[in-house]
UniProtKB/Swiss-Prot annotation:
The keyword Ribonucleoprotein applies. This is one of the proteins that binds to the 5S RNA in the ribosome where it forms part of the central protuberance. Part of the 50S ribosomal subunit; part of the 5S rRNA/L5/L18/L25 subcomplex. Contacts the 5S rRNA. Binds to the 5S rRNA independently of L5 and L18. The lineage of its organism: Bacteria, Pseudomonadati, Pseudomonadota, Betaproteobacteria, Burkholderiales. Gene3D superfamilies: Ribosomal protein L25, beta domain, Ribosomal Protein L25, Chain P. Pfam families: Ribosomal_L25p, Ribosomal_TL5_C. One of its GO terms (biological process) is translation. This is Large ribosomal subunit protein bL25. Belongs to the bacterial ribosomal protein bL25 family. CTC subfamily. GO terms for molecular function: 5S rRNA binding; structural constituent of ribosome. GO terms for cellular component: cytosolic large ribosomal subunit. The keyword Ribonucleoprotein applies. Keywords: Ribonucleoprotein, Ribosomal protein, RNA-binding, rRNA-binding.
């Protein structure tokens, strides 16, 4: 995905305010061996780009005024407190030979044909909507698919139940290497978990 940028030499709060009044957005590109690059973006262009999922989870081609192109990854966006206005954007340079640490969205499919929904009338709870991963830039997926087609009422799907793309590894947090991804919650019941069996045992 491509977007346009213009290098800027003037920095500081007052300069940033002037840019915003002119319909521009201050931004920065950092990482790699080159020095950080201060840039400005057209507000309307970046606003609409940020509404697209792929802009958040893809290698982006930044075209700097004059024709130079750099591959970057979106890192953070600062929004106005109450207006739909982009205040600042951070991008990171991409090195084809260095692994990326980023987050990618999960796409859930086939929920409507699963036994959980068709037979049990369950509500599918998406416990996670994205995964924290590491991979080389060339292997970065735009999303990871989670097939719910075989999910039963009261059942659940963990990370071990889905197949990660080749070359992609999950970054565990807090020692949880197999987090809960989705659960089929049945009205008046719930999703099955490891504590259910223990709870049903009579007291000694």
């Amino acid at each position: 995905m491509k977007f346009n940028a213009t290098a800027r030499s003037v920095q500081g709060s007052s300069a940033s305010r002037r840019l915003r009044r002119a319909g521009r957005v201050p931004a920065i590109v950092y990482g790699g061996t080159a020095a950080p690059l201060n840039i400005e973006l057209d507000h309307n262009e970046i606003y609409h780009a940020l509404r697209k999922e792929e802009f958040h989870a893809s290698i982006l081609n930044m075209v700097i005024e004059g024709g130079k192109t750099e591959e970057v990854l979106l890192r953070s966006v600062q929004w106005h407190a109450y207006k739909p206005q982009v205040m600042h954007v951070d991008f990171q340079r991409v090195d084809a030979n260095q692994a990326l640490h980023t987050k990618v969205p999960l796409h859930f499919i086939n929920a409507e044909v699963s036994p959980a929904v068709k037979l049990s009338g369950a509500i599918i709870s998406h416990v996670l909507t994205e995964l924290d991963i590491t991979c080389l830039p060339a292997l970065l997926p735009q999303f990871i698919e989670v097939n719910l087609g075989d999910l039963l009422g009261g059942g659940s799907i963990h990370l071990a139940d889905i197949k990660l793309p080749k070359g992609v590894t999950f970054n565990a947090h807090g020692g949880d290497t197999n987090p809960l991804i989705a659960a089929a919650v049945v009205k008046g019941g719930g999703a099955a978990d490891e504590g259910d069996a223990a709870a049903e045992q009579p007291a000694a």
